[in-house]
């Protein structure tokens, strides 16, 4: 399958590109002008440009012979209150709908558990959404808008891939584990945390890439979890990470309160 990937050079994108190439797919990886491709993109066709500012001519060139679009691009995903989420959401929508109008009939879009908002228990495709921060609000709007567009575009096969907490290659994922490694490098004795009692869904980046590949080549439309399906406490995840990496730093709990929009137990249903 010939697959266009936005955000191809990002933390998730580079692993997905590698997985798709290993499975024999042709990948068209979109990068910003002047961006240096990660080594995992070796073998992919590189397409340079800002997806929010592509001319019609460049869009036509992009979709030639392509069968599928995987939209991973998103700015400031780890800063849930960044103004870019709401400022850019219509640009994402306009890009995606323009791709469909140019003939791409299989579109998969990265979603997030933060669309759901405060919720306790397993999340599935029918879980009500009431997002509590700009990141979740923007992603939730994009999901609703895209499925509305799909409802009047019957030839479009739309898949919404809902991501959870991603681990692996932790030097580069900007997660709590990245911060633990940075604190270890700085020879800090303790790493401050909240209670650590919350249960989350942690999925390794390599497993996530496999799940994404399976979904984007399927013929199903709808909302799909890309997750482990297993709740694990933050405390357990942190202590396992420290032990596995032979770190000297120690977790210090109850330094920070939990975020107002974080539930005590939330994970993806599989």
Curated annotation (Swiss-Prot):
GO terms for biological process: O antigen biosynthetic process. Its EC number is 1.1.1.339. NAD(+) binds at residues 11-12, 50-51, 72-76, 87, 112, 135, 139. This is dTDP-6-deoxy-L-talose 4-dehydrogenase (NAD(+)). Pathway: Bacterial outer membrane biogenesis; LPS O-antigen biosynthesis. Keywords: Lipopolysaccharide biosynthesis, NAD, Oxidoreductase. It holds the Pfam family Epimerase. Catalyzes the reduction of dTDP-6-deoxy-L-lyxo-4-hexulose to dTDP-6-deoxy-L-talose. One of its GO terms (molecular function) is oxidoreductase activity. PANTHER family: DTDP-D-GLUCOSE 4,6-DEHYDRATASE-RELATED. InterPro entries: Epimerase_deHydtase, NAD(P)-bd_dom_sf. Belongs to the NAD(P)-dependent epimerase/dehydratase family. It catalyses: dTDP-6-deoxy-beta-L-talose + NAD(+) = dTDP-4-dehydro-beta-L-rhamnose + NADH + H(+). The active site is at residue 135. Substrate binds at residues 112, 135. It is an enzyme of class 1 (oxidoreductase).
């Amino acid at each position: 399958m010939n697959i266009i990937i936005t955000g191809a050079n990002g933390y998730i994108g580079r692993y997905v590109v590698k997985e798709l190439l290993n499975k024999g797919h042709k990948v068209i990886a979109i990068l910003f002008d002047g961006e240096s491709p990660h080594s995992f993109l070796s073998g992919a066709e590189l397409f340079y440009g800002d997806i929010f500012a592509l001319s019609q001519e460049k869009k036509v060139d992009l979709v030639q012979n392509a069968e599928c679009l995987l939209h991973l691009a998103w700015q400031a995903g780890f800063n849930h209150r960044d103004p870019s989420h709401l400022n850019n959401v219509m640009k994402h929508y306009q890009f995606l709908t323009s791709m469909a109008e140019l003939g791409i009939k299989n579109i998969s879009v990265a979603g997030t558990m933060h669309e759901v908002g405060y919720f306790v228990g397993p999340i599935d495709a029918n879980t009500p959404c009431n997002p509590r921060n700009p990141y979740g609000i923007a992603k939730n709007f994009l999901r609703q808008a895209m499925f509305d567009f799909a409802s009047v575009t019957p030839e479009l096969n739309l898949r919404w891939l809902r991501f959870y907490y991603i681990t692996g290659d932790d030097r580069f994922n900007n997660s709590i584990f990245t911060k633990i490694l940075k604190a270890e490098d700085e020879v800090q004795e303790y790493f401050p945390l909240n209670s650590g009692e919350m249960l989350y869904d942690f999925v390794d980046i390599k497993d996530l890439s496999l799940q994404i590949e399976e979904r984007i080549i399927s013929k199903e439309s709808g909302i799909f979890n890309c997750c482990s399906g297993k709740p694990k406490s933050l405390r357990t995840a942190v202590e396992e990470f420290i032990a596995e990496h032979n770190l000297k730093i120690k977790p210090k709990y109850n330094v920070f309160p939990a975020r107002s929009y974080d539930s005590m137990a939330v994970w993806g249903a599989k």
